[in-house]
Amino acid sequence: MSVICTSILASILLYCLHMVVPEVRSQVQSKKTQKHISEVIKERIDTPDLPFSHEAWIRLHEENPDFQGYLMFQSELIKEPVVQSYDNEDYLHKAFNGSYDGAGTVFMESSASLESRNITVFGHYVYYDNSSRFTPLEKLLDQQGYEDNQVVYLFLGNEVRTYLVSAVFFITEDEAEYYDYSCPDMTEEEYKEWIAFINMKNVIDPIAGEADVRDRILTLQTCKKWDSSQRELVICREISRIPYPGGGEGNG
């Protein structure tokens, strides 16, 4: 793997060392943050028929310039704001508004751009709340759970990207040392190897087909329950980019 991509691995491994434990303060903060974001989204008037909009994106970006987009499963299994910082550790235990939150905020790989071929988004497995952050991703390990939750949206500043889940599996520390899955722009050979590995490890039967080297992918990562040496990865293939009605001026 490339030198740049290998350097990213340290941040990923450190991320999963932070086991989230029950914290009453964090639970209260998380619920307040989620309620506020939901209210901002509902108050918009530009596209009331859509679950998100350019107007909502602008308001949340004004509140936190690190805000990149809103990740939402069509089933609403997960609905989380996505931030990006210069440091992958920045939002491990920080709420969207900057206060302390043991469950942190879902964040995008610091070295990636929205035009990267592989965008990795990290979220905690929260032991005390099975609906928080990326904890619900474990439901996709079951075939029926995957089929019920296979469509994913990423709402950005001027468009919505639609993805289909194509693979779900666990990756070990040893495997992650070789396959630097969070690397945003792998070489052609690295990407080819990674896609082949994805399809080999996949534990689901993807209805819409396997991942392909021609795909742009969104990788969702969380920890495995009671095992910090492994991470669960959900691989999503991008299938469309659609501008909001009325447009917008870029993705930030």
Predicted regions span which residues?
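N-terminal Sec-pathway targeting helices
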Residues: 1-9
